[in-house]
Amino acid sequence: MLVIRLARGGSKKRPFYNLVATDSRNRRDGRFVERVGFYNPVAAEGTENLRIALGRVQYWTGNGALLSPAVERLVKEYSAKVSAAA
């Protein structure tokens, strides 16, 4: 089963997450099919901390991918931000 979830990167005490489409059996930071965005929870003020390719997320969910709870929250937040800016 395909899932869209967070894969951790960055260094110790400086987390950085990639939003990836991957098989649910793969490891958290293992092999993935496509990177659909990123999330930086400790980004400096005024820098971009979240970017998601909403079109690709819709494509994968249309093909049966599930969103993890954290990714679902981030997608909701980002789509509200994008629609408010438009």
Swiss-Prot record:
**GO molecular function terms attached to this record:** structural constituent of ribosome
**Any one Gene Ontology cellular component term annotated for this protein:** cytoplasm
What keyword terms does UniProt attach to this protein? Ribonucleoprotein, Ribosomal protein
Matching SUPFAM superfamilies, A to Z? Ribosomal protein S16 (SSF54565)
One matching Pfam family is Ribosomal_S16
Q: Which GO terms describe its biological process?
A: translation
Task: Report the domain of life of the source organism.
Answer: Bacteria
User: What's the family?
Assistant: Belongs to the bacterial ribosomal protein bS16 family.
Q: What is this protein called?
A: Small ribosomal subunit protein bS16
Source species, please? Bordetella parapertussis (strain 12822 / ATCC BAA-587 / NCTC 13253)
Gene for this chain: rpsP
